[in-house]
Every structure is written in C-alpha cells, then in structure tokens.
C-alpha cells in the first residue's frame, strides 16, 4: 500500500513478486513512466534532467526501453491479487490517465480491481470527507482480503465525499 511513489512501489511489487502479496492499494501512483515523463508540468521543467537520470531519458531508444521495463503497466498481467486504485481527477503530477490505463489492463486480464476516483482532488486527498471515505474503502478492502475487521462508513459520511467507484 502506498501513495505516489509508494503507489508505484506497490504496483512494482505486485508485478514482479506477485506471490508475496495478498492484495494491494495504489493511491495516485504512476503506472507508466513514459507517460509520466511526457506529462511533466511546466513548473517541473527544472527537474526534468534529474527525472531522466533516475527513470531514463525517454527521448532515446535506450532510455525509453528502460522506462518501459520499469513501468508496472507493461507487466500488469503478472498481478494475481485484487487491487484498489484511488486517483484524484485533477492530479497535475500523476494524471488520471496513469490509473485509467492500469485499470484497463487489469480488467482486460481479468484481474479484480476497485477503482475510486475523486473528482475534486489532485495529488493526494485534501478534503477531510474524501480522506474519511478513502480510508474507509481501503480499510474494508484490506479486511476483505487479509481477513480482518473494518469499521463501516455511514451512508452520510460516504455521501459527504465525492468518491466515485468506477465499475467495468
């Protein structure tokens, strides 16, 4: 379970070592390093060189191959366990398309995925109502897949959030 890089790390773990996981939770984590780098906002331009050093220069064949090899999207069919993905629609850093393409790949492979969108959030959850709803959904998801318990969220609390569970 993780947010941003932690979400990416969760996806990497699930794709490279699926036997070690009972389930996973990815919150605003990138799934495709190529599209992540191609959508760098203008105010991040100053750190592009650092990102290319860490991920690979996608303007070169070798760098693009490296970025793709490190991208969970291209190994999504290796995932064997259920995944919950939460994404802010207005995320300027990890665009919704990162999660959309991962969800599509998982569903195409018959892998169970719960996809929760927050239309009024960005890179993380700021509104307390959304954080409460997301945490409750995660708690219920983990209880179901790990065999624990979860405190149910009330209908009023869920309705106060903007969480949208995206079905097939």
How would you describe each model-predicted region?
Residues 1-168:
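Active-site-proximal cap/loop segments of hydrolase catalytic domains
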């Amino acid at each position: 379970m993780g947010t941003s890089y932690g979400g990416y790390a969760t996806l990497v773990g699930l794709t490279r070592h699926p036997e070690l996981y009972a389930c996973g939770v990815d919150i605003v984590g990138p799934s495709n390093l190529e599209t992540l780098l191609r959508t760098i906002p203008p105010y991040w331009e100053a750190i592009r060189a650092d990102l290319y050093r860490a991920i690979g220069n996608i303007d070169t064949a070798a760098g693009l191959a490296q970025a793709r090899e490190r991208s969970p999207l291209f190994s999504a069919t290796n995932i064997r366990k259920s995944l919950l993905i939460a994404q802010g629609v207005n995320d300027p850093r990890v665009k919704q398309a990162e999660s959309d393409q991962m969800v599509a790949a998982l569903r195409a492979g018959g892998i169970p995925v719960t996809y929760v969108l927050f239309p009024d959030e960005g890179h993380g959850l700021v509104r307390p109502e959304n954080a409460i709803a997301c945490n409750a959904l995660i708690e219920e998801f983990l209880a179901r897949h790990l065999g624990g318990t979860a405190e149910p969220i009330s209908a009023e609390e869920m309705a106060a959030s903007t969480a949208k569970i995206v079905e097939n």
